[in-house]
Amino acid sequence: MFQDSDFEEACRELQNPNINEAGYEFFTESSHDGCVARIYRQYNETSGLYKYKVYGTLADVDPEICSEVYMDLEYRRQWDTYVHELYEKEEDGKKLVYWNVNFPFPMSNRDYIYLRELREMESFEGNKIWAVMAKSVPCTSVPEKKGVIRVDDYLQSCVLSTDGKVGSKGEISKFYCNALQLHST
């Protein structure tokens, strides 16, 4: 599903974020206790929705542990109050993720069916990187649910690396969500 070039492109943004050239505008920034997040967005004229990129730093977070938490669906169900339903499903030899997300009234919940892959890679400087790619896939064995909007154009990349400092500090040098577009079809 994912090519080496997909992962390489995501990892390149560690050194050279593709924001202005791609038409992203600064949206907001937040910082707390050594954690910083900068959010950029790109407007889609056709859909009227935005794509988002988030770049941030987490103090005292090991990127390998962060990647394990990111991939652990059972643990996510424990802490994420937006999870209505979340599980893996095998289809055609591939592990798919089904995720039904609670949205506040009066909005409808959204659900996603996507394939994801985690790769441990090496940066161009030789540092270890954990990269996750996720993308919507069709799945006829999980029918759409009444009152829930199926998101069929989900694309996400998450790239985690260390900041190289002594100790357990880590950096999410690039955590960007492409096409978190909540389309109804």
What name fits each language-model region?
Residues 1-185:
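Eukaryotic helix-grip
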